[in-house]
Amino acid sequence: MSRRRKHGDSSGLKQTPRKAMATEEGSLVFESGKRRLRAARGSGPQGPGERPPRPLPQQEQPPVAASCRKSNTEERYETPKRMLQMDLLSSTFSSPNDPDGQNDIFWDQNSPMTKQLDKGRKKQLYTTDSDEISHIVNRIAPQDEKPTTDSMLGVWIGDTAIPCTPSVAKGKSRTKLSCTKLKSQNQEEELMKLAKQFDKNMEELDVIQEQDKRNHDLIQMISEAETSLNCRDNVQMQLLCDTVPEIDKALLKKPVKENTKISVVNDQTSSQKPFDQNAEAAFIAMFDGSTQKCSGQLSQDLSDSFLKTSNTTFGKKNTLKEEKIITNESVVTENLPSKTLGSLSHQVDNPGMTKSYVTFCTKEPGTFNKHIDTFTTSDFEDDWENLLSNEPFVMQNIETSELFPAPKTIQIADQKEMCSFNSKEAKSKSGMNKSVDVKLRDSKILQGLPSNTWNNELTDAEKYRFSPKPNDKPNKLSTTGNKMKLEKSFNIVVNQDKIQDCAVASNLTKVNEDTHTKFNCKVNASEKKSALKPGCSNKSIFNQSLKVPANVKPFGSATLGSTTSVCNPDQTNGSKLGSFFDDWNDPSFTNEIVKACHQLENSWEADDVDDDILYQACDDIERLTQEQNIRVDSKTSESVLEINNSSKHGAKNVFTTPKQGSQFMQSKHLNLNSISAQTSSLANSLQINKSVKMERGEMYGNSPGFLGATTNLSIYSKNSDCQISNLHVSCNNPDVPKQVNSSKSVLTGSSSLNVGSHHMSTEIAASKNRLSTLHLSKSTTRGKAQSDLNRAVRLSEYVFTKMKNCPMLSPFNNSSVTGSISDTKIAQGLEKNKTVNPLPGKAVQQQPLVKFSEPLKQPSKEEEEKNRKCSPEEIQRKRQAALIRRMAKAQASSVKKGR
């Protein structure tokens, strides 16, 4: 290559300018073909000949050599043409068949490059190594370089974007398709195998069915033999059923203290159907052992199967012990005989009746008579009794023979667990607030009810209509899925467990307008003997009722239909907390209640935060009420309801606020010298938020609680359509009592109510479809009373007036001083949005407790500490004493009735 370079240089020296121009024309051809590097190579050997001063060294060459160079130069002119043809064949410089091109690229790195200028002039350009290398690289493989973009979108969007490689996707799809075809072929083969296996199994099944048919024939022969025995048992059972009522009465006199009767269905009253032999054989084949007693159950009618099952049990075990068990646990079907004392019959063909009821009755203290289906065995019956004792919907009606000699019947619905009861009051004794629950707690209430109480009836789902009836007559309960028809003497408990729908009609009289409800009842504390009655229910506790708003849907709107005290404990916590009332002098409690009281004592003693919150709330409200200077003398006129609930001791009470979270609130060791009242508001709608507004605008929660202790609390209700004028209200009901405050006669509604209670909770209910809730406003004195009454309030109102000098039969009335009255305004409703404070959902400490008390003599801290320390011991002592008394009376009564 070095020799060729020298040869090229020497030949270039002998070039004439004309020949150099021809070479330039060849180089222009290369440049037009974008072969600048080739043009540089072609002009490189001739470059020195471009300059005219260079011919001086050419003369030094010998002439022979000059002729050789001349011939070589002519051959050299043809070289670019040959290279051009090679370049046309190979479009790139990367061809390995072009050694000259490769040599020129790498060998002549420092050679000058010529560039055509205007008018044929040349300019020699000198480039560095880095520039040539970058130029060469860009010419060799420019398509491999991708411009760098600031955003990653440039990789996928634009002219230089990477394609989406559809070929790869197609390849994958073809692969999947081939796999699918392969799988489909395999599935066909598998289906053929399965079909063959199925044929084999069917052949085996035919053999098995033939064997089963032979076995069935054998079983049918055995069943026919047993059927003949059952016929004999039925004949014996027919004789036994004639003596069942006498056995039942004889057995019930011993454990039950004339407060419960069992409705026994006579076999003669219902038609007997023979057992289905095929069903009998099928059950014998399915079951073995003692479970064969339930044969024929599933293929028969409900009531007939109950009777036949009890017949079978009677027939197979003819001992006296079995007769007692069946009598104590006899099946009560839907057909209750009308001759049963204390209850009217539930007819199966009643169009309003959609659920079957089971009648429960109470035994001696400590046990229950649970009437369950007797198609189960004796072992399972024992377990079922244990289960029923723990079930939250099981209710117990307890009553003493001294107070209520008439029997009671409790009827419980299974499906929705609606619990209600029919009660009959004694002719000589006055009725009282009755509620039932398996686990009654240790609280104390004294309530008296005169004999002229009212029975009520809930007849419409949207309207409450109440008709008074003599309380000597027995009561009737008929219910549907969403409508309750209630007739009862004082308080009625309706429990629906899962759907917290409660409809309560209590102590209400019929008003002239259907849309209004007046609550007319009277309780006197003087009748303490007839007032000692526990009032508890598993889900709904109704102690006193104020008013039922108009157009209330009891079940459809999922709200409480009457303004009563309602406690809806959660099902899981129902065994621990609830609103419970008890009087330890009442001998009708059972040992079960005493055990429950002991269990509840631990939770009370362990929770001291509630006491602190209660005392703090009481102190704050007492301080606010004492700062009020508006006081007038008052006279108490006759009122429709006067409740004097007084307790000898500061017994513990658990009040439950039935919001959706089923929150619980405990109030313990109430101050005997102070008054507090609790009003629970039940509404299954978050849109109804009630608020308590003090005179100074202090909020205590939307569901205020009043726990009354010593002073009277006068509550006056106003119908929703009554317009209050300055000093009077026009009402169509002539029976509305009047409340006289000083010299001003104020008529504040169709019903009024004086409440002075120690443990009394009042429930104001609101319906979901009617957002106009009850407003609690005050009927105060002089100018402020007029200003409040001037407002035309369409929503129903309750006026709370606390009277210091009110005749009460209360042992704590000595701390009340006569002569003055303090009025406190409570505003409750949706219109008072500025005072709305939603009820706390979780914390028990934040439950609203509003205590209205203004005794002249404030209780000292020492007295409070003393009451707080002594109340648990007193309760324990009373429990022990009550337990001893109950056991003694139970034994005495059992001995007396056994004779």
Swiss-Prot record:
The keyword Phosphoprotein appears for this protein: yes
Recorded superkingdom: Eukaryota
Stretches of the chain forming a coiled coil according to its record: 180-210
InterPro entries, per database record: ETAA1 (IPR029406)
GO BP annotations, alphabetical order: DNA damage response; DNA repair; mitotic G2/M transition checkpoint; positive regulation of protein serine/threonine kinase activity; regulation of DNA damage checkpoint; replication fork processing
Compartment(s) of residence: Nucleus
Per UniProt, location of the Glycyl lysine isopeptide (Lys-Gly) (interchain with G-Cter in SUMO2) cross-link in this chain: 416, 444, 485, 539
Region (Disordered) residue spans: 1-82, 833-899
Motif ATR-activation domain (AAD) boundaries: 105-111
Motif position, RBM1 motif: 607-622
Listed Pfam families: ETAA1
PTM text: Phosphorylated by ATR.
Motif RBM2 motif: positions: 868-890
GO molecular function: protein serine/threonine kinase activator activity
Modified residues (Phosphoserine): 467, 810
Skewed-composition ranges (Basic and acidic residues): 71-81, 859-877
GO cellular component, one term: plasma membrane
UniProtKB keywords: Coiled coil, DNA damage, DNA repair, Isopeptide bond, Nucleus, Phosphoprotein, Ubl conjugation
Domain notes: The RBM1 (RPA1-binding, also named RPA70N-binding) motif mediates interaction with RPA1. The RBM2 (RPA2-binding, also named RPA32C-binding) motif mediates interaction with RPA2.
Function: Replication stress response protein that accumulates at DNA damage sites and promotes replication fork progression and integrity. Recruited to stalled replication forks via interaction with the RPA complex and directly stimulates ATR kinase activity independently of TOPBP1. Probably only regulates a subset of ATR targets.
Oligomer status and interactors: Interacts (via RBM1 motif) with RPA1. Interacts (via RBM2 motif) with RPA2. Interacts (via the ATR-activation domain motif) with ATR.
The protein's name: Ewing's tumor-associated antigen 1 homolog
